[in-house]
From Swiss-Prot:
The protein's annotated pathway: Isoprenoid biosynthesis; isopentenyl diphosphate biosynthesis via DXP pathway; isopentenyl diphosphate from 1-deoxy-D-xylulose 5-phosphate: step 3/6
Function summary: Catalyzes the phosphorylation of the position 2 hydroxy group of 4-diphosphocytidyl-2C-methyl-D-erythritol.
Sequence similarity: Belongs to the GHMP kinase family. IspE subfamily.
Gene: ispE
Reactions catalysed: 4-CDP-2-C-methyl-D-erythritol + ATP = 4-CDP-2-C-methyl-D-erythritol 2-phosphate + ADP + H(+)
Gene source species: Salmonella gallinarum (strain 287/91 / NCTC 13346)
List of catalytic residues: K10, D141
Protein name: 4-diphosphocytidyl-2-C-methyl-D-erythritol kinase
Length: 283
């Protein structure tokens, strides 16, 4: 029985904000790709119906943690539909590698891994579509991790079209700050009217991120990290930050630059992959 479950990072290879809805949510067009790097969840089934998170996150109550919320949500929905075996529970711990507030999707990925893993371990039998619907109630980025394939996303991020962008090597750098998403989306100078384009058109254009100008303006650490990376390769912000990344055609090129990273920059090299490491384990 599989007990170690990948919870990979994602990059937004581009991100354009096309509008803002009446409810305040922003509409966007973005390209998600996974990394062969991320957190690992250790999940051991229990038979007493209890959910225990054995590795609490500092400053976050266990019941507010997306890991616990995802487990309880699956338990509730599967139980209500008669698909939860009696006594289903779990002990969950996490090896955390992805920073909070980094734009790598760590929390969303954790939630998706819990949904997929417990659906498998508990033998609930929910479909990917059902798990995706549950995931969306936990966060806009959760569905892409549930589905497990690189995707072009529209709407608020929930309308997904599978795509296969080139699987490049990336140097990903965390500049030592955490950026809450609302800080970027509430900034009055954030571009909110980028014209919508087809995926075919977008893939032919130079990639960029509408959030980057705000992140660089408000966080000098992000600006410094991007300024350094841009000396070596095409680089940009992922999500709303704070992580930034540079793309390379080979691992050796990426690692050569990594060796020159300044001490204040926490960085790693990873491969972009179109099939999530989580789903690769299930094949």
């Amino acid at each position: 029985m599989m007990t170690h479950w990948p919870s990979p990072a994602k990059l937004n290879l581009f991100l354009y904000i096309t509008g803002q809805r009446a409810d305040g949510y922003h509409t966007l067009q973005t390209l998600f790709q996974f990394l062969d790097y991320g957190d690992t969840l250790h999940i051991e089934p229990r038979r007493d119906g209890e959910i225990h998170l054995l590795t609490p996150v500092t400053g976050v109550e266990n019941e507010d943690n997306l890991i616990v919320r995802a487990a309880r949500l699956l338990m509730k929905v599967a139980s209500e539909s008669g698909r939860l075996p009696a006594g289903s529970g779990a002990d969950i711990s996490i090896e955390k590698r992805l920073p909070m507030g980094g734009g790598l999707g760590g929390g969303s990925s954790n939630a998706a891994t819990v949904l997929v893993a417990l659906n498998h371990l508990w033998q609930c039998g929910l479909s990917i579509d059902e798990l995706t619907t549950l995931g969306l109630t936990l966060g806009a980025d959760v569905p892409v991790f549930v589905r497990g394939h690189a995707a072009f996303a529209e709407g608020v991020g929930e309308i997904l079209t599978p795509v296969n962008p080139p699987e490049k090597w990336y140097l990903v750098a965390h500049p030592g700050v955490s950026i809450p998403t609302p800080v970027i989306f509430k900034d009055p100078q954030l571009p909110r009217n980028t014209p919508k384009r087809s995926i075919d058109t977008l893939l032919k254009c130079e990639f960029s991120n509408d959030c980057e100008v705000i992140a660089r303006k408000r966080f000098r650490e992000v600006d410094a990290a991007l300024s350094w990376l841009l000396e070596y390769a095409p680089s940009r912000l992922t999500g709303t930050g704070a992580c930034v990344f540079a793309e390379f055609d080979t691992e050796s090129c990426a690692r050569q630059v990594l060796e020159q990273a300044p001490e204040w920059l926490n960085a790693f090299v990873a491969k972009g992959v179109n099939l999530s490491p989580l789903h690769r384990e299930l094949l």
